[in-house]
Amino acid sequence: MAIRIAINGFGRIGRSVLRALYESGRRAEISVVAINELASAEGMAHLLKYDSSHGRFAWDVRQECDSLYVGDDIIRLIHQSEIEQLPWSELGIDVVLDCSGVYGSREDGEAHVASGAKKVLFAHPGGHDLDATVVYGVNHQDLRAEHRIVSNASCTTNCIIPIIQLLDIAYGIESGTVTTIHSSMNDQPVIDAYHQDLRRTRAASQSIIPVDTKLAAGITRIFPKFCDRFEAISVRVPTINVTAIDLSVSVTHPVGVAEVNQLLQKAARGAFRGIVDYTELPLVSMDFNHDPHSAIVDGTQTRVSGQHLIKTLVWCDNEWGFANRMLDTTLAMAKSGF
């Protein structure tokens, strides 16, 4: 029997999750029963069908009253601002995928559970008091039935954690720095406008904009031994999708470029197949749009200095890759038991 899910928040990630479910052929395993979103039903249907990053949705989409029709499937639409008022019990929801970007605390998760959901998966980093933070492919096997309120971490954490794990096991990481070169997001204005972060008052399409990031904290959340040993910075660039991450790590064991690339390529074809990919083609960011992997290593950009400093460039579709991991983690949560 398919897992019954509800999507709370139908923005970039919420819509990508729904599209990824249909495109990946996993509807026999996961059924979207309801979507809660404050926007109009007409707008929800339109943006599902037509997407500036991912193109037209292949399935027929129409909206009638409080229902969204996707092919032959009927999804109930809800427009409720209070989690406590959501009808998850009535709808028999197994897992809520909270893609709102607003909620992420233990209290928020408990509110979903109190409304009748068996489990909750946040599509962004949560607090330390959540039951688990999952990077699929690295620690999803640690999920237990009692883990009711879970975070899927962030798109950048999902991108870089598998690479860090591989390099650490092989060569022993001492410390590292990460620079995220991230596409612009909907918290940036089209033209200059007020924002509490003065850099984000500036037009997204006109500048490379440094922003705060909690990626270093995300790394230590998964690997506590790296506490105070990683630092991260982030810049937003004038593209609408796809992100690159520049990872530099100092390692204990001497190594060369060929060895690093061989390690990462082998992992992409083996243990991390479907999660990590590897390429040496002369590609640019748009070539990774709609790529379902969490991370794509660009082997042409690997560098090693003094045998102990490794630099890698890793791409990801920060929407599509993450949406696919949301589905993977949902299935892992269900497999762990309710």
UniProtKB/Swiss-Prot annotation:
GO terms for molecular function: erythrose-4-phosphate dehydrogenase activity; glyceraldehyde-3-phosphate dehydrogenase (NAD+) (phosphorylating) activity; NAD binding. SUPFAM superfamilies: Glyceraldehyde-3-phosphate dehydrogenase-like, C-terminal domain, NAD(P)-binding Rossmann-fold domains. The active site is at C155 (nucleophile). GO terms for biological process: glucose metabolic process; pyridoxal phosphate biosynthetic process; pyridoxine biosynthetic process. The record marks H182 as: Activates thiol group during catalysis. Pathway: Cofactor biosynthesis; pyridoxine 5'-phosphate biosynthesis; pyridoxine 5'-phosphate from D-erythrose 4-phosphate: step 1/5. It is found in: Cytoplasm. CDD domains: GAPDH_C_E4PDH, GAPDH_N_E4PDH. Its EC number is 1.2.1.72. One of its GO terms (cellular component) is cytosol. NAD(+) binds at R12, I13, N318. The keyword Oxidoreductase applies. It catalyses: D-erythrose 4-phosphate + NAD(+) + H2O = 4-phospho-D-erythronate + NADH + 2 H(+). Keywords: Cytoplasm, NAD, Oxidoreductase, Pyridoxine biosynthesis. Substrate binds at S154, C155, T156, R200, T213, K214, R236. Homotetramer. Catalyzes the NAD-dependent conversion of D-erythrose 4-phosphate to 4-phosphoerythronate. Belongs to the glyceraldehyde-3-phosphate dehydrogenase family. Epd subfamily. This is D-erythrose-4-phosphate dehydrogenase.
